[in-house]
Amino acid sequence: MLCPICQDTNSRVLESRSAESGKSIRRRRECMNCQHRFTTYERIEFLTITIIKRDGKKESFDKSKLLRGIIRSCEKTGIEVSQLEAFVNQIEVELQGKCQREITSAEIGEIVLSKLSGISEVAYIRFASVYRKFQGIRDFVDTLNHLQNQKENLEFTATVPQNSEISLQQDVINV
């Protein structure tokens, strides 16, 4: 490692420790030439993810832009910003796990919506209204119905014992 004082490349590591929640290693070094002590960091180099927008334009993934949009949709819901930062970090990890250099904004929007539905229904509706470009009340109603159906399906699956036979019967009533 190059010494910042004398530019010598000969140094020794005095101490190493994990930093930034395990995403980097902090090393304390000493130059063998001038005995100057300095700190270096080793970080994982993530894939550069390119977002393909609806209009076909491409831009680099901007974690802070995603966070701003999610914070806006979660205003006055009582969700802490630190929780939202962790939420965005999870999304970034998921995107990195796909090992794709390019991903559509639609894919990211769907990932966000699937995760928001478990956190806040209000935030889900707000995010969906911007992401899906709602044109009127019908779009809100359709999304609310979809969210309600998802919730009912989850509740139904949670009450059904595993490995049991289920017989569903539909009653039709003519009025």
From Swiss-Prot:
Keywords, ordered alphabetically: ATP-binding, DNA-binding, Metal-binding, Nucleotide-binding, Repressor, Transcription, Transcription regulation, Zinc, Zinc-finger
Transmembrane annotation, as ranges: none
GO molecular function terms noted in the UniProt entry: ATP binding; DNA binding; zinc ion binding
Name of this chain's protein: Transcriptional repressor NrdR
Family statement drawn from the similarity comment of this UniProt entry: Belongs to the NrdR family.
GO biological process: negative regulation of DNA-templated transcription
Family matches, as InterPro entries: ATP-cone_dom (IPR005144), NrdR-like_N (IPR055173), RNR_NrdR-like (IPR003796)
Ranges of residues in domain ATP-cone: 49-139
Cofactors, names only: Zn(2+)
Lineage: superkingdom: Bacteria
DNA-binding listed as a keyword: yes
Stretches annotated zinc finger (unnamed): 3-34
Function of the protein: Negatively regulates transcription of bacterial ribonucleotide reductase nrd genes and operons by binding to NrdR-boxes.
SS bond partners: none
